[in-house]
Amino acid sequence: LDPWDHIESAMGLDVMGFEVESKKAYNWLRTYQEKDGSWPSIFYSTEQNKLKETNFSSYIAVGMWHYYTNFNDKDFLYEFWPVLDAAIEFTLTAQTEHGDFFWAKDDKNWLDDSLKTGCSSIYMSLFCYKKIAKEINKQDRVSDIQLKNLKECLRRKSFRFDRNWES
């Protein structure tokens, strides 16, 4: 199980109208969020995994926006804002001068590669984060320049992605 799949499952619960169960999924994420705003890449695995993936952390924004659009529960956005804001702060620390985001961090360092799929997911996550911030009148820590730089990197700097393996 990873945080991204967990959020996808919560969105499936949203579509089916399982509001209480979906909210429990977000409570689970809140419980296991690391102090730096991230989540481990894998839960319930026999292998020790200390990676923290940026697109996994930021994806909670997409899930929260999905929950809100399904249930129109603004209190949910307020309640989980600190979780979301911390996750986005973690992700933003991984943006490079090219606009892409390092895909993961180990115990100490960012891994020097970016994934096109991961950065595409981050783009949507940052977009949803901005919508949530506006909806509940919270400080938005994502600048339009950061989004523009990511979009331009995705469109024009393919050399930035998947550098450590063939995709």
Give short role names for the model-derived ranges.
Residues 36, 107-108:
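A general structural signal for short secondary-structure boundary/capping elements
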Residues 1, 40, 95-104, 111-167:
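Catalytic cores of carbohydrate-active enzymes
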Residues 2-96, 119, 123:
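Aromatic-rich carbohydrate-recognition surfaces in CAZymes
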Residues 47-48, 109-113:
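Surface loop/turn signatures of beta-propeller and other carbohydrate-active proteins
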